[in-house]
């Protein structure tokens, strides 16, 4: 092989540290610039020390991977990963914590391809793939004695450690002050953030001692019966935020269909359990609240649908999203396949109206009291323009591309509002279908989103921000309820009471588990009356 460059291993690792610090860490440098520019007084030495500290720290952690036969493939992979991470951080404002890594591991081909655009391909090619290939055309000279190589590496690490120690001694208070007030900085260092979060995720998901599977609600039973069975639709939205719902005060008419359906109650103070589907969906269907939620426990435990099924309610889950994140694994379910409906499916995704296909037959096959759950594709980004058919393109100009950061704010908001409006159409059509069943069933529909979405506010796009610093756009979600007169009478509900609470009372995903058990009159020890939204508004209290 013809080499274009020749170098010794220790200087080469130091060079890599400089390259990674400069090339892939633009997000943290820009963030630090914003932070420091707002301070009244900043020490010049402190500012100068920042890149020196990062280079020294990266060199310290890079050196152990400078082993012959490992160095080139390891850093080639790191170049590509860092290129992808730096682009998404810079353009979308995302942070690579464990939740983001979980999203990466659980995404499907359709979701992954939605993020592919000319800018990201160009960036990853120039800063990731080409340097990765270039590594193999560099001749690296190693020491002819193993102990000499070990000594050189140890010396390099000691020098790095000495630099870090010296900087800490000189500017400790400055680093503590900036770090304490901006805790997210530690999650912005590339590639440390990706490697650290990935390692933790893999350990917790695959390497910890397996947790015994836990059953829930083995004592579940119905406390009320009716000559007329109940049919309920539970609709799970995707990336819809309360802020853009006209029924919650948004200036645009994004809910023209449900607002005219009659009797729809919109909950204005609803919050999600997480900022990503991988967290929110398992959380809302579990009996754990957001504060104590543990994804590993949830994966090894039954949830809401299991308890309802034990109580004798027929359950069926229809999914037009990636999957149900495990919550429907033990109930009858179907994953919509794009090949099944060429009219409503384009490429590898389908419009949410596809969920209404075959609905009458599915309801007819179920026995007794029935609940169908529908998982919408909703406002899944970044390809918002693919979530609604052309005839539902109400707000224009929209943003017909995946690199949404290159659209104007007007285009992006128009596109997102079109997705909200189209989801509203689907929900309204489900309500219309329930009205057709009123002679045979007491009917009801509950709609809520899994999490919200950022549209460029504060430089953030999409979702998955760490919950403690996530903006309201990612955590404030819509929730709507519609009930037939027969359902209201059967459940002895005071609608004025429910409407009043919906307007002013703060609720969250934590309320879903017990609210569903309560409204279905399921008696079980895992029911918590305090979390039941319906209980205060029933003349006969839930069990």
Task: Give the location of each predicted region.
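A short beta-strand-to-alpha-helix junction
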Residues: 295-302, 410-422, 468-475, 488-516, ...
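Metal-dependent active-site segment of extracytoplasmic phospho-/sulfohydrolases and closely related
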Residues: 233, 419-464, 513-516
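Catalytic cores of PAPS-dependent sulfotransferases
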Residues: 64-73, 92, 307-317, 362-365, ...
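Short beta-strand segments
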Residues: 271, 317-319, 371-378, 417-423, ...
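A long, amphipathic alpha-helix that forms part
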Residues: 189, 357-360, 399-443, 481, ...
